């Protein structure tokens, strides 16, 4: 996985590692991934090419979106209106409820066919935010309309919002959410297309209900992971000594939870294991309730898992892996990965299931042969669930199917 740092000049993103990462899957093209993380003032500003309304940049935030009624703060509003947006002709009124931010264009070095978006945000009571994406094929092409990715909080913004020519506000509508356009779509929690795109933007819209003054939705981190198919060869891999270990991730079983949902909560169970490893004891059912996606009636929404983990105290992001060396680096640094797999019958020896259309488990380390140590929540006991899977088989059921992972980090120090 290539890490791209989002600097102040976002139109030319700097490579933080030297090559595309690839995975091997006999007879098929391999995946290559790039990761862009915005988590500081410079990356959100993007050489003044971002747009915002009722928003402020702060070193500790780094992005603060005012929601609900506000006491007048003309200096902060002026800074965004004049320096960043440069085209607003009026100041916000004190009784407006909503705010928004549009990122600079974020370019993929090799183009992309799929894209994961994830976020860490703080929402006060009676507030919420939604995230949207739009993409374009090249600088000569127009952007697509905004596609709805997901939301968080108790007050959800309107389903759609269109920016008028003067740019001073958004015209919103509560009609159906737009999730597909021009041969591309948001498939529950990720963007996918048969076409290749060159750049993306995200938009976050925040709002609130009630009359409490001076509330803000704080955006701490936004991550985008671009993915494309490639013919490039897979890197060789020998597990380094520091990755030959089993991280002390406390095992949990989804099977011991409430019978009505036990078969559906592999994602929150795996998140709870990762949180426990980070020193945050969260009940599995509490994690499931927090992460549950009522719009799709699933517990396995990837974006909600990342934000849910953050709401319990652990920041993180969605990433994709296609290079075992990158996986080993995370293990060596003490970071387990919650990974998303799909396996046909006979594809994963020793698993506590014959096949799965979709399942999540925790990757905890490597053994001396380079095979992979995991905590699989589909087992009922630690003895049955702390397993070693063959690396070639896990590559087939994980990396060749996208390599999606939750990267859950240590709690943020205040």
Question: Which stretches of residues belong to each language-model region?
Answer:
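Active-site-adjacent structural segments surrounding the nucleophilic cysteine of cysteine proteases
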Residues: 19-22, 32, 37, 197-199, ...
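Boundary at the C-terminal end of the N-terminal hydrophobic targeting segment
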Residues: 16-21, 27
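Extracellular carbohydrate recognition and processing domains
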Residues: 145-195
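Noncatalytic regulatory segments and standalone regulatory/sensor domains
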Residues: 31-35, 45-58, 62-89, 107-110, ...
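Bacterial N-terminal signal peptides
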Residues: 5-17
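Beta-strand acidic-aromatic groove motif in beta-rich domains, primarily in extracellular
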Residues: 126-133
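Conserved active-site-adjacent core of cysteine acyl-enzyme catalytic domains
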Residues: 93, 103, 281-413
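A short beta-strand element within beta-rich, extracytoplasmic domains
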Residues: 110-123
């Amino acid at each position: 996985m290539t890490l791209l740092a989002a600097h102040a000049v976002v139109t030319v993103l700097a490579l933080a590692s030297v090559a595309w990462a690839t995975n091997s899957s006999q007879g098929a093209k391999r995946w290559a991934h790039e990761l862009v993380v915005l988590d500081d003032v410079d990356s959100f500003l993007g050489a003044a090419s971002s747009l915002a309304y009722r928003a402020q940049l702060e070193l500790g935030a780094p992005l603060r979106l005012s929601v609900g009624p506000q006491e007048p703060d003309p200096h902060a509003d002026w800074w965004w209106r004049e320096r960043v947006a440069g085209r607003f002709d009026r100041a916000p009124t004190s009784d407006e409820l909503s705010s928004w931010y549009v990122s600079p264009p974020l370019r993929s070095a090799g183009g992309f066919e799929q894209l994961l978006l994830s976020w860490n945000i703080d929402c006060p009571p009676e507030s919420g935010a939604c995230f949207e994406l739009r993409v374009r094929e090249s600088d000569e092409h127009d952007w697509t309309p905004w596609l709805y990715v997901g939301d968080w909080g108790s007050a959800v913004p309107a389903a759609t919002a269109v920016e008028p020519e003067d740019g001073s506000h958004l015209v919103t509508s509560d009609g159906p959410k737009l999730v597909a356009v021009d041969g591309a779509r948001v498939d529950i929690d990720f963007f996918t297309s048969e076409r290749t795109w060159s750049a993306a933007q995200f938009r976050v819209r925040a709002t609130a209900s009630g009359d409490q003054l001076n509330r803000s939705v704080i955006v701490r981190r936004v991550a985008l992971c671009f993915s494309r198919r490639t013919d490039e060869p897979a890197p060789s891999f020998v597990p380094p000594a520091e990755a030959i270990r089993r991280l002390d991730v406390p095992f949990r079983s989804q099977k011991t939870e409430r019978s009505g949902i036990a078969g559906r909560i592999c994602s929150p169970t795996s998140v709870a294991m990762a949180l426990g490893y980070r020193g945050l004891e969260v009940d599995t059912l509490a994690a499931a309730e927090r992460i549950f996606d009522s719009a799709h009636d699933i517990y396995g929404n990837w974006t909600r898992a990342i934000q849910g983990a953050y709401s319990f105290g652990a920041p993180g992001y969605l990433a994709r892996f296609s290079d075992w060396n990158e996986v080993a680096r995370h293990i060596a640094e003490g970071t387990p990965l919650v990974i998303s797999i799909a396996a046909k019958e006979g594809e994963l020896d020793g698993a506590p299931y014959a096949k799965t259309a979709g399942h999540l488990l925790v990757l905890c380390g490597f053994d001396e042969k380079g095979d992979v140590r995991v905590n699989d929540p589909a087992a009922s006991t630690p003895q049955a669930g702390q397993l070693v899977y063959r690396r070639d088989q896990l590559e087939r059921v994980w990396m060749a199917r996208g390599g999606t992972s939750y990267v859950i980090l240590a709690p943020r120090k205040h």
